[in-house]
């Protein structure tokens, strides 16, 4: 039996394939374990994806969308003069992964496909993802969906010495490119149950990039304020190319600071190149990383647990590599968090270890008027099965839906400061804290 699991992330997509009882392995696309989740509109009907989309973006940035998943609520994307449904953009990403999997299977299609999704995604957002998958013939035969933290917990439990026996619990801290998500997952005799989950829709690796770009802008923009304004609001193709190059260099500097105490950042002319230190970056992002750790702590409490009773705190998502993340969690919880293998691949690999009928989402059973984190462990006798066959109508509604909002964690700017800033590509403008009562939980 051929099983393909796909973790379609905000910035990167990871696929894992297992065949004939062999251990699951990452499907390399274009020679890499991760494929950019980017799309480029090449004419009215053709969508390029992955690294080819990134390459073409250098020629015409207006036709490029680096993070289509982040725009799942918008219905459609304007790429140059082409209007592309978000469902079709996601389908293009899934199609490229499926093509590579079929090639590696010698032309055969997977017998089963598992798609992971954020635990807080409701029925409408899941319908967008599943509708995209149904547009890809190679994925439609036996399509299942499961929450990302459940897959992460299964990955944790698959390692020797890291078992999660029935009754055991694990906290999952997932800092991806687009959002921060956390959950407490409990092991049952049949599989796993999500005991509590929460997150921050305004915190992810892209927001860390934004904070660093703002910081650099405050340092160098005085050299030519008019030119810097054109970087913020491009007026020409050359301006858009310069803006994209700056974004890439800022991201590379952020990643380098996870390994080194300082990093050089090439700046477009006429601005001088900049040097940024890990200490500077940590000062910029510490307040918001502290927010994420407090959300995790509140989620553990909502599950009726204490940190000392957990089997561990598991770090997933590429941005969890930032050293300050582990430091703050250790200070708050008194335990050193665990990161196994590449955090980018943990969810896709873990999806293979989840029993087909062994997932429950406790939060789905909470009445709309109640708080999302009130149900205790153990699970009810007949829990809602979240790992389920996907029967989404490919034409399901894909229009806007409410953004996530937590009554105790209102949105805040990532840097905590004001100044020149690059627009966050693909994210609606931030307008500060809002009344949580006016923004229900996502469907």
Q: Where do the PLM segments sit?
A:
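Gly/Thr-rich phosphate-binding beta-strand-loop-beta motif of the actin/hexokinase/Hsp70
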Residues: 1-25, 159-195, 250
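Conserved NTP-handling cores and scaffolds of large molecular machines
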Residues: 43, 72-76, 98-101, 105, ...
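Gly/charged contiguous loops adjacent to phosphate- or pyrophosphate-bearing nucleotide/cofactor binding elements
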Residues: 59, 206-330
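Phosphate-binding loop and its immediate beta->loop->alpha context
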Residues: 16-137, 142-147, 210-255, 261-263, ...
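Conserved phosphate-binding/catalytic loops in two-lobed NTP-binding clefts
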Residues: 138-148, 326-352
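Acidic, glycine/GT-rich loop-and beta-edge segments that sit at the periphery of enzyme/chaperone cores
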Residues: 10, 223-229, 346-349, 353-443
